[in-house]
Swiss-Prot record:
Record organism: Dictyostelium discoideum
Family matches, as Gene3D superfamilies: Glutaredoxin
Broad class of where this protein is predominantly found: mitochondrion
One Pfam family cited in the UniProt record for this chain: MRP_L53
Descriptive protein name: Large ribosomal subunit protein mL53
Family: Belongs to the mitochondrion-specific ribosomal protein mL53 family.
Top-rank taxon: Eukaryota
Transit peptide start and end: 1-50
Location(s) in or outside the cell: Mitochondrion
InterPro entries xrefs: mtLSU_mL53, Ribosomal_mL53
Keywords for this protein: Mitochondrion, Ribonucleoprotein, Ribosomal protein, Transit peptide
Gene Ontology CC terms: mitochondrial large ribosomal subunit
Amino acid sequence: MREKLNLLAKLKSVVYKFDPLNPNTRSIRSFIPLTTCKRSRQLAPECSISFDLGPQNTSPVIDIKFVNGTEKSIKTDTLELMSIVESIELLKKSIRIEEIEKMKTTETTLQDILQPVNKKKDTGAKANR
C-alpha cells in the first residue's frame, strides 16, 4: 500500500524560481503539481505558494520557509522529481530533530541514579497473619 505524502506539512511558504524556457526546469515543473493540487492545498491551507519567473538562463530553485522560520533553498537543475521530494522530507525531518534537541529535559545526575529508592513496608495480607 502506498504511503500518503503531505509535502506541505510544516511549511509556511514555497517559492518556485525558474525560467520556463530553460530546458533544465523539467524536474521543478513536474514537482509543481504535487504542491498545487487540491488535496495538498486542503491538507495545508496555511502554506503559501508563489512563482517567480526569472530572466533567461536562471537556474531553477525552490525556496522553502518552514513554520519555525527556517529557510532553505533547493537547486533542482540536476535533480529528478523523487530527489526533490526526498530532499524536502529530509529537511522536514532535520527540523523535527532540531526541535526535539531544543526541548528541555530534566537532567538526572549520577547521584540521583545511585541513590536507593525508599520503599514502603508491605501492609498486605502477609503482614496481617
